[in-house]
């Protein structure tokens, strides 16, 4: 049987980090087994579902590179199908109409709680076979088995057993004519041939209810894999403040999509002690059965380390468009400075994110207007005009502007003055960047461009008073 998985977000908000991990595991499992991955949008919550959220989910999936074979399929476009299946259950005596008011339902729950019983629907309409009538309280309830046990072998959690006596007759169609979650997902997964349902363990309590509906329909029951939640760095439930942010905020924070994929894959799954995986390695090695049953903790330092690894090892040309995105966010005209790929080469050993890289790179895209006063006092003092002047002379004479030629010119300047390279590099670094800290001096000067470098040296000479 062909493996078919699905990711089924509810568009009531953006795709957060937990949802992204679920999507990734569903995608990896399908790809690993040579199957198909389906995207379904569970948008039947009409009050909370928005097109903005749908667009954000699709954008995040695209950014992460999680392509799907079918979809997006929208539940709101399948209402007639849900009605058809509900009517089938009604005709077979496996579901029934109920018309209790909100006050009557509240009274049932209060009576149960007074007896120290689980608050639940008491089955008042179960055997009445009430006909359809136009009523604002009309619902359709599923006849849950009264006896027996629901047993399933979760691919992550192991064997789980729930007594049917713990379950009541849940609503499968609401008064507004829309199906409930537990009913719609069963019909969807049945129609779509889903063989493995991979989702968060907050859905475990829904699973026995859903299995009973599958069996009532005579539908094949898929395998289930319930992943533990992701905790924050203190071991508490994730919040927006502690990492449960929109996935695209990770893009804005300067993380590479494949670095986030690598990190999320390891957030609950492992292959020995290996930390870094190419996409092909993930596809070859991933098996949902190997997902840890214990909750994983978000570790932003680890994510930063993984991201820096890919900044250091990826082709700079592939990183360049993402650096340009960060620069534009800062209001930078990327055409007004060096090629982004060259900036990546210069800075990738010094930063963990593209956001940091862009912030450090601004100095090469805008006129230098501010200087670190301590750096000026230390390195642009009287006497610094000599190495700066010689460096300017050598740089101005270059026929071709390249890192290698800039390096040769600066070393020639130091040799001509019989100075150590540091005596040339430090005043030049302050002249070019306004600070004492920058990448290799040859790269620092090269990235300023010939005209920009000479102009900044001239400004520094004026500052020294020796123009």
From Swiss-Prot:
Residues that hold ATP according to the record: 240
Family note: Belongs to the class-I aminoacyl-tRNA synthetase family. Glutamate--tRNA ligase type 1 subfamily.
Gene Ontology biological process: glutamyl-tRNA aminoacylation
Keywords: Aminoacyl-tRNA synthetase, ATP-binding, Cytoplasm, Ligase, Nucleotide-binding, Protein biosynthesis
A GO MF term: tRNA binding
Subunit structure: Monomer.
Species whose genome carries this gene: Xanthomonas campestris pv. campestris (strain ATCC 33913 / DSM 3586 / NCPPB 528 / LMG 568 / P 25)
PANTHER family membership: GLUTAMATE--TRNA LIGASE, GLUTAMATE--TRNA LIGASE, MITOCHONDRIAL-RELATED
Catalytic activity as recorded in UniProt: tRNA(Glu) + L-glutamate + ATP = L-glutamyl-tRNA(Glu) + AMP + diphosphate
Protein name, as recorded: Glutamate--tRNA ligase
Organism classification: Bacteria, Pseudomonadati, Pseudomonadota, Gammaproteobacteria, Lysobacterales
């Amino acid at each position: 049987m062909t493996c078919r998985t699905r990711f089924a977000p509810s568009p009531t908000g953006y795709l957060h980090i937990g949802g992204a991990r679920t999507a990734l595991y569903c995608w990896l499992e399908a790809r690993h087994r040579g199957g198909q991955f389906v995207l379904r949008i569970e948008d039947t919550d009409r009050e909370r579902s928005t097109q903005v959220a749908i667009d954000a989910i699709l954008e995040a999936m695209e950014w992460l590179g999680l392509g799907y074979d079918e979809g997006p399929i929208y539940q709101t476009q399948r209402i007639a199908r849900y009605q058809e299946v509900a009517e089938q259950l009604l005709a077979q005596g496996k579901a029934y109409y109920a018309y209790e008011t909100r006050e009557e339902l509240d009274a049932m729950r209060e009576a149960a709680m007074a007896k120290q019983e689980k608050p639940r629907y008491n089955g008042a309409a179960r055997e009445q076979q009430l006909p359809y009538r136009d009523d604002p309280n009309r619902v359709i309830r599923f006849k849950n088995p009264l006896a027996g046990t629901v047993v399933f072998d979760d691919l992550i959690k192991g064997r789980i057993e729930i007594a049917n006596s713990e379950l009541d007759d849940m609503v499968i169609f609401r008064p507004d004519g829309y199906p409930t979650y537990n009913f719609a997902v069963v019909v969807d997964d049945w129609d779509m041939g889903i063989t493995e349902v991979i989702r968060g363990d907050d859905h475990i309590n829904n699973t026995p209810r859903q299995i009973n509906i599958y069996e009532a329909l005579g539908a094949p029951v898929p395998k289930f894999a319930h992943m533990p939640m992701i905790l924050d760095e203190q071991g508490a439930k994730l919040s927006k403040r502690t990492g449960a942010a929109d996935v695209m905020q990770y893009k804005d924070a300067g993380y590479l999509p494949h670095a986030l994929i690598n990190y999320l894959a390891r957030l609950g799954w492992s292959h020995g002690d290996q930390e870094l995986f190419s996409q092909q390695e993930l596809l070859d090695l991933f098996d949902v059965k190997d997902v840890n049953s214990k909750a994983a903790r978000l570790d932003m330092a680890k994510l930063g380390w993984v991201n820096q690894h890919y900044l250091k090892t990826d082709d700079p040309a592939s990183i360049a468009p993402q650096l340009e995105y960060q620069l534009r966010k800062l209001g930078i005209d990327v055409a007004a400075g060096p090629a982004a790929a060259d900036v990546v080469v210069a800075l990738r050993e010094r930063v963990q994110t593209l956001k940091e890289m862009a912030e450090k790179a601004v100095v090469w895209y805008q006129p230098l207007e501010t200087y670190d006063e301590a750096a000026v006092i230390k390195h642009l003092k009287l006497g610094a005009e000599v190495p700066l002047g010689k460096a300017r002379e050598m740089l101005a004479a270059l026929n071709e502007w390249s890192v290698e030629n800039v390096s040769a010119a600066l070393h020639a300047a130091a040799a001509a003055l019989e100075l150590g390279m540091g005596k040339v590099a430090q005043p030049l670094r302050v002249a070019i960047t306004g600070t004492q800290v920058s990448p290799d001096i040859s790269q620092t000067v090269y990235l300023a461009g010939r005209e920009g470098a000479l102009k900044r040296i001239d400004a520094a000479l004026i500052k020294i008073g020796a123009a």
